[in-house]
Amino acid sequence: MATNRNSRIDSKEFVEQFLSELKAILESDTFVIERDLDILHKKRNESATDPYTTTNTMAALEFDANDVCEELKAITVEDYAETMLDDRNEAAPPFFVFYRNIQTRYVYIKVKIRDRATGKVFCVSFHFARYPKPSPLPYEG
């Protein structure tokens, strides 16, 4: 079930297509993590002590950008929660939301392919789930 009017549940095939494209980009010989994977570490109004920020989650997991990239490659359709429109630009590619169990905790991941032609990926969220994971997820089990 989508969480708000800016979100939707895409078909399993559509999500699988997105994941296939994402994995192809991340595994491409031309993909350079430092240049092509944009991870938003802190949102404007987040507190530095908030355990649910991307920065603090990555620190708690002892992750760097390479580890985030590996987790993005490992996402499956069963991890899918919803698709969200980019509220800054509705014409831009949407974000796909996933929940992954990493080191016994659910991590909320919100990612999009920013530019397919140049292989740019934008991970706007990679943090411990602030709220319980919806259960079941659309294609879980």
Kindly give the residue locations of the regions a language model identified.
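Compact soluble domain cores
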Residues: 2-13, 17-20, 24-92
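Phenylalanine-focused residue identity feature
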Residues: 14, 18, 31, 63, ...
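Functional cores of ribonucleases/endoribonucleases
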Residues: 73-120
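Enriched for short, Lys/Arg-rich terminal
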Residues: 113-141
